[in-house]
Amino acid sequence: PQMCILIHNTPKSNLTEAMFRDFIIRNGDGFGAAWSDGKKVHTIKLLDPTAKELAYVYNQHIKGRDAIIHLRMRTH
């Protein structure tokens, strides 16, 4: 079955550009992430991202945090 990818990123997680490259082979239709700084929930969305863009966003905003990451697979 076709499915999106949902990742629970922990403070110890370390996703790499190579991992994102693998993820977007089948799930490259969109990216979303959400995390809290204790005061506010932050979100980010990208359409048709490259692995390089995802790695940059991950390293700047998500790495070292509890976060939810969603990689979309178009199903229609």
Q: Which sequence ranges carry the predicted segments?
A:
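Short beta-strand or tight-loop elements
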Residues: 64
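Extreme N-terminus nucleophile/cap motif
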Residues: 1-53, 67
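Short acidic (Asp/Glu) patches
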Residues: 46-57, 61, 69-76
